[in-house]
């Protein structure tokens, strides 16, 4: 970690490196998965422990199987993020009894790079076929930010995810979850990973949530859900 600059103004011009930005986004995904599992009651509240992150009290799963699954995802996700291979990450909540997808959290990733990437195709690994990442969003959003400003944006997004319980239907019965990672078609994929359909919500409602950006990435959030019968 770089030592703090003696002049206050130095913090204003600090730019997060591409590698540092990729690590920050991957870490955000990790906490997002845990937060969704807790807030949506996919696992019992007693299966979570509190940690301090982004200036917030975050809850992370202490279930060994869940931790192992997320760790496996993150180890690969870190590598793909470092090489700019990810266009989105999706958390899908599924009814165990019916197999119906009832909730879908989508995190779209834009990489602010000048290298030509627009022609690359993507596939959802550990799940899905990809829509092209729309890199046309204004790069103006990438004005230099301090890490503190980025952390504040992330904290605001997590507060919104937490507040989503006010409009999302209560999940009925036992549910499970899957994580889909949309990676470039030329990405190296571990043998235990496989392609998947997009696991969209049939006739679902959609709500656009907040996003955040660094000088290298922008992440936008969308939740889709099935209305109760």
What is each stretch, according to the model?
Residues 68-75:
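Eukaryotic beta-rich interaction modules
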Residues 1-61, 67, 80-229:
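Long protein-protein interaction modules used by eukaryotic assembly/scaffold proteins
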């Amino acid at each position: 970690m770089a030592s703090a600059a003696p002049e206050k103004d130095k913090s204003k011009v600090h730019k997060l490196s591409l590698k540092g930005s990729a690590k920050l986004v991957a870490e955000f995904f990790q906490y997002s998965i845990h937060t969704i599992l807790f807030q949506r009651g996919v696992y019992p509240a007693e299966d979570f422990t509190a940690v301090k992150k982004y200036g917030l009290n975050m809850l992370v799963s202490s279930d060994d199987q869940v931790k192992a699954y997320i760790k496996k995802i993150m180890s690969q996700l870190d590598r793909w993020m470092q090489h700019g291979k990810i266009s989105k990450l999706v958390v899908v909540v599924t009814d165990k009894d019916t197999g119906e997808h009832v909730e879908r959290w989508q995190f779209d990733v834009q990489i602010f790079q000048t290298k030509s990437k627009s022609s690359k195709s993507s596939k959802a690994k550990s799940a899905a076929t990809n829509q092209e990442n729309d890199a046309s969003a204004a790069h103006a959003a990438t004005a230099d930010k301090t890490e503190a400003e980025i952390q504040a944006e992330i904290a605001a997004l997590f507060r919104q995810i937490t507040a989503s319980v006010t409009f999302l239907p209560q999940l009925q019965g036992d549910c499970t979850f899957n994580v889909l990672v949309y990676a470039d078609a030329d990405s190296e994929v571990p043998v235990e990973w496989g392609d998947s359909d997009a696991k969209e919500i049939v006739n679902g409602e959609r709500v656009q949530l907040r996003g955040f950006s660094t000088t290298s990435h922008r992440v936008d959030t969308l939740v889709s859900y099935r209305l109760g019968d």
